[in-house]
Amino acid sequence: MLLKDLPEDARPREKLLARGPAALSDAELLALLLRTGLPGKNALQMGQELVDTFGGVAGLLHTGPEALKSIKGLGPAKRAELVAVLELARRALAEELKEKALFSTPQAVRDYLQLQLGGRPHEIFAVLFLDSQHRLIALEELFRGTLTQTSVYPREVVVRALALNAASVVLAHNHPSGAATPSRADEALTQTLKSALALVDVRVLDHFVVTSTQAVSMAELGLL
């Protein structure tokens, strides 16, 4: 069934204009972005397929353009538009968290890191530099590739911490494979950086392993 064949109060565009965006389901909002479907599958059905396939809007926020190719009828133009909208949403949420949140609990950091690293296709080591009140000074991506004690240089982390006048840091890296369990190499790297930063009175509060679906706190696991 085409969207135009639905009752007027059931069509996403008319429903939004009459009742506001909050009245629409996630699938209906996505249908407005998609605009058209393909034979046998209208835009609303495609929107529902996106929600079901990627686990709702939260899952879509961590979905890259390659994964979207699995949705039949989602061509390059629609994928590009959808990725652009999702990126704007990620940036807006990240700005709000950065401006308003104190990074004093694992959950606050987890939410922020999920937005920043959850959907990245390559392994990245990042550091959140915090002031004495656990407010975010900066998030910096310092290294890329397979992380080992030899590929992450403690001196560079220390130099950045001093340059930013950070009182503490939270370490983070992503596992694109989807396995969130910290490895022995992750534990060894954490201790190396913890010792190096202690020499300049900068505390390591936590080290998170981030995947597209979760962020695991090494502090909560007793590995810090």
Swiss-Prot record:
Zn(2+) binds at residues 173, 175, 186. A motif (JAMM motif) lies at residues 173-186. Residues 102-224 form the MPN domain. Keywords: Hydrolase, Metal-binding, Metalloprotease, Protease, Zinc. The keyword Metal-binding applies. One of its GO terms (molecular function) is metallopeptidase activity. Pfam families: RadC, UPF0758_N. One of its GO terms (biological process) is proteolysis. Belongs to the UPF0758 family. NCBIfam families: PRK00024.1 (NF000642), radc (TIGR00608). This is UPF0758 protein Bpro_0948.
